[in-house]
């Protein structure tokens, strides 16, 4: 009787281990690497074995050299965008200084419906929904933002003007200063 209980217990453990492993693929270094075709002056992405996954020329420029979960690319007639592994456009990336916004304090700015929000630089996930007319990069855990501002252009450069600036933390909550 004790022997049967032990055998049944071992069977249960074995069954549980097999069941627990189903549907949970083992995480590997599944990433893509950007490449540049010098003869055609075009960019694309290859896997670790050199197989072309995203053909060169599909995007004008690939800003993300190692494509894990998302990549920032320049899409013709669309601008700087974040795409996922299925090449779905996740959102537009805020344009800054002739390129996509740079990560600052782990976040970068993104745009949706002409409003600015913030995405996580590691995962590409939107952390603060787009709601600001003007938003500066995060520094030391806070960012200066406004929901009512105007853009004043000075030829090549422009500045944001607002009487309603305030600061937010990395969760999007207003900080009292």
Where would I find each of the regions flagged by the language model?
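Bacterial Sec-dependent N-terminal signal peptides
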Residues: 1-28
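Residue-level detector of conserved, function-critical positions
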Residues: 24-177
